[in-house]
């Protein structure tokens, strides 16, 4: 490869989804030290939904944004401290500027894959301040390669130095990765990245496929710690980069040690694939919906897989969590109606 691959470790951001955003200061400090030793280029830290997202709607974090960022920054020397900012959750004055005061080195500004225009204010402002800024296209499986080129092109125009495709639902196949990443690499003048989820068991091969297609940024988490079925594990991505002799700063043994540190401290349950996470990948539904879907399933007595498939049919995206309850109630009502019909027929 002509450009050295950058590794963005999202363990302390995406991983927060897996523990209902309850990572503590000591956990953050310990893992930040391990990630620094492993040689990750960027350590992304924060609430699972990014800056300013701690709320009743999507989960209240155990630690404030500022406390998380300061705890991580104190342990970093060569790795950059990164944050996720989603307009609507994060605002410039309340969230972004205080985060920069905490030592944030780069910001990734995210939006749904067809709504890049909402990132304009934040990307242009950050770029004018001299901050490294990248764009994220969420739920990118939902858009064609052509649409992604158009939307990523807007982010490039606003000043983003890179655009990362987020497989928020774990719905990508290697062929989809080749097509979409390859198209962006060919058509844009900035770096392209890929953020995998493992709902279909393809996070590692999709990450390596992205690199082969020209991506120069890959996201990872320790033990795949993240929303739903988890992400591409840092230890497995590092191992595959080593085997394939792909150049990167990350150090294999230290990456393995970082994953061990995470499991010892806070990865209580290593992400696995089950009926719910697999259905989420098939339906193309945001991985972070797994836990609320399970809760709604128990509350209303309906199959969580049916909830996910209906959410997929409705093309529901992150931020529309209220729809989960609506769908569960509708399915429960349909089931009750069917039961009454059967009971009536049986008595005729």
Curated annotation (Swiss-Prot):
Enzyme Commission number: 4.1.3.39
Superkingdom of origin: Bacteria
Cross-referenced CDD domains: DRE_TIM_HOA
Residues where Mn(2+) binds: 14, 195, 197
GO BP: catabolic process; L-leucine biosynthetic process
EC top class named in words: lyase
Pfam family, one: DmpG_comm
Protein family according to the UniProt entry: Belongs to the 4-hydroxy-2-oxovalerate aldolase family.
PANTHER family: 2-ISOPROPYLMALATE SYNTHASE 1, CHLOROPLASTIC-RELATED, HOMOCITRATE SYNTHASE-RELATED
Protein name: 4-hydroxy-2-oxovalerate aldolase 2
Organism: Salinispora arenicola (strain CNS-205)
């Amino acid at each position: 490869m002509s450009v050295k691959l950058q590794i963005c470790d999202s363990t302390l951001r995406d991983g927060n989804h897996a523990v209902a955003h309850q990572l503590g200061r000591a956990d953050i400090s310990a893992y930040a030290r391990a990630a620094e030793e492993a040689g990750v280029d960027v350590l992304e830290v924060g609430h699972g939904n990014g800056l300013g997202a701690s709320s009743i709607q999507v989960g209240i974090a155990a630690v404030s944004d500022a406390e998380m960022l300061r705890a991580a920054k104190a342990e970093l020397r060569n790795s950059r401290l990164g944050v996720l900012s989603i307009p609507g959750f994060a605002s410039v004055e309340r969230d972004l500027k205080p985060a920069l005061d905490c030592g944030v080195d780069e910001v990734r500004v995210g939006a749904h894959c067809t709504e890049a225009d909402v990132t304009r204010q934040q990307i242009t402002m950050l770029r004018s301040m001299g901050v490294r800024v990248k764009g994220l296209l969420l739920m990118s499986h939902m858009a064609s390669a052509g649409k992604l080129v158009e939307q990523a092109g807007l982010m490039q125009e606003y000043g983003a130095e890179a655009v990362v495709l987020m497989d928020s639902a774990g719905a990508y196949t290697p062929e989809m990765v080749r097509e979409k990443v390859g198209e962006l690499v060919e058509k844009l003048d900035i770096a392209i990245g890929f953020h995998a989820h493992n709902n279909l068991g393809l996070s590692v091969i999709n990450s390596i496929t992205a690199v082969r297609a020209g991506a120069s940024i890959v996201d990872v988490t320790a033990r795949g710690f993240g929303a739903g079925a988890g992400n591409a594990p840092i230890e497995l991505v590092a191992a595959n980069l080593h085997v394939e002799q792909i150049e990167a700063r990350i150090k294999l043994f230290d990456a393995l040690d970082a994953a061990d540190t995470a499991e010892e401290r806070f990865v209580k349950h290593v992400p696995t694939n089950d009926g719910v996470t697999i259905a989420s990948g098939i339906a193309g539904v945001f991985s972070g919906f797994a836990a609320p879907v399970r809760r709604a399933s128990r509350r209303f007595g309906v199959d969580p897989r049916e909830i996910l498939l209906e959410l997929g049919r409705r093309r529901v995206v992150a931020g529309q969590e209220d729809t989960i309850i609506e769908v569960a109630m509708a399915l429960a009502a349909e089931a009750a109606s069917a039961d009454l019909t059967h009971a009536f027929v049986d008595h005729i």
